[in-house]
Amino acid sequence: GWASKIGQTLGKMAKVGLHELIQPK
């Protein structure tokens, strides 16, 4: 459903954000 879709999107954004914090460009 839409809830799981939003959860996946937030998870993906969190992963990317974390990666950006660890290895800033």
From Swiss-Prot:
Cell cycle among keywords: no
Gene Ontology CC entries for this record: extracellular region
Function, in words: Antimicrobial peptide.
Source organism superkingdom: Eukaryota
Primary location: secreted
Family that this chain belongs to: Belongs to the gastrin/cholecystokinin family. Magainin subfamily.
Gene Ontology terms: biological process: defense response
Natural source organism: Xenopus boumbaensis
Subcellular location: Secreted
Protein name per UniProt: Xenoposin precursor fragment BM1
Alphabetical UniProt keywords: Amphibian defense peptide, Antimicrobial, Secreted
Tissue and organ distribution: Expressed by the skin glands.
